[in-house]
Amino acid sequence: MDNERQKALDTVIKNMEKSFGKGAVMKLGDNKARRVSSISSGSVTLDNALGVGGYPKGRIVEIYGPESSGKTTVALHAIAEVQKQGGVAAFIDAEHALDPVYAEALGVDIDNLYLSQPDHGEQGLEIAEAFVRSGAVDIIVVDSVAALTPKAEIEGEMGDTHVGLQARLMSQALRKLSGAISKSNCTAVFINQIREKVGVMFGNPETTPGGRALKFYSSVRLEVRRAEQLKQGQEIVGNRTKIKVVKNKVAPPFRVAEVDIMYGQGISKEGELIDLGVENDIVDKSGAWYSYNGDRMGQGKENVKNYLKEHPEIKQDIDNKLRQKLGIFDGDIEEKDEKQAEAEKNENTNLFDEE
């Protein structure tokens, strides 16, 4: 580029920085954080399927699927992982159905989980926006989009029609939220249900409530479905669950993670370590027997799960070797010094006031 054009460009950039603040325009190569940072999902199998070691920071994630498929369980595991790393988590319980006993069993620190049970959709999304713009929250979960009922619908009569109200609400909210989520480096997880379109003869009749905006704004979309029941004798103790990455802007999509979700316990970390360990030649399987480093751990998967629970050091060793081989690591919450945190808070507050 010749000198005259470069001078003109430099002048324009200086003017833009005066108007909109430093960093409003930059060269892509000047950005230090080129690799997408992430937070662990709490499952090694899912972290591997997501391609970047977990849910990307500063992005929107949608988790959807049929009833009782494990959507909330998957989201709660991510909250537990964030809290283990010293991060802050918030949960917008629009369904008014969060079970604190179950959440605690999954490893969630319920004493330090910020919970809101909004009266209507607008209130829930405004609370979510305030949390995001504070710059102090690392993950926020909205459960669920389908339960974010517009205020007009709640205050109206039963049987009144409100065409497209929820879709417009979500579209407006996501337009406001997307920029703030990126700047605050917060991961926003929206849980969604599925509905069936009427009169669809060909193709998939299933769709998700809340319009199309969430599909567009999401960097990652996960479809959670039960594959089969897990039994001990005649008793059903859990479900084999398939989690398909149907959209991924940060890694190749359409990968599938299969996990065991046990009733009252959540994702069986021992189960996925066994499965992945065998696949990656870290755990040896001969018939029904499983061995690690030449030592037999047990016969049958359930016995090996119990063995790993009783020997946490072996479980951790297998986990470390798997993450090293697959190139995935626990997402770390970046520690910010007080000045940086205060600057971000002021910036986000100013943005909030302007809008």
From Swiss-Prot:
Keywords: ATP-binding, Cytoplasm, DNA damage, DNA recombination, DNA repair, DNA-binding, Nucleotide-binding, SOS response. Residues 336-347 have a biased composition (Basic and acidic residues). ATP binds at residues 65-72. SUPFAM superfamilies: P-loop containing nucleoside triphosphate hydrolases, RecA protein, C-terminal domain. Pfam families: RecA (PF00154), RecA_C (PF21096). PANTHER family: MITOCHONDRIAL DNA REPAIR PROTEIN RECA HOMOLOG-RELATED, RECA. Belongs to the RecA family. GO terms for biological process: DNA recombination; DNA repair; SOS response. Can catalyze the hydrolysis of ATP in the presence of single-stranded DNA, the ATP-dependent uptake of single-stranded DNA by duplex DNA, and the ATP-dependent hybridization of homologous single-stranded DNAs. It interacts with LexA causing its activation and leading to its autocatalytic cleavage. The keyword Cell wall biogenesis/degradation does not apply. The gene is recA. InterPro entries: AAA+_ATPase, DNA_recomb/repair_RecA, DNA_recomb/repair_RecA_CS, P-loop_NTPase, RecA-like_C, RecA-like_N, RecA_ATP-bd, RecA_C_sf. Disulfide bonds: none annotated. GO terms for molecular function: ATP binding; ATP hydrolysis activity; ATP-dependent DNA damage sensor activity; damaged DNA binding; single-stranded DNA binding. One of its GO terms (cellular component) is cytosol. It is found in: Cytoplasm. PROSITE patterns: RECA_1, RECA_2, RECA_3. This is Protein RecA. Residues 333-355 are annotated as: Disordered.
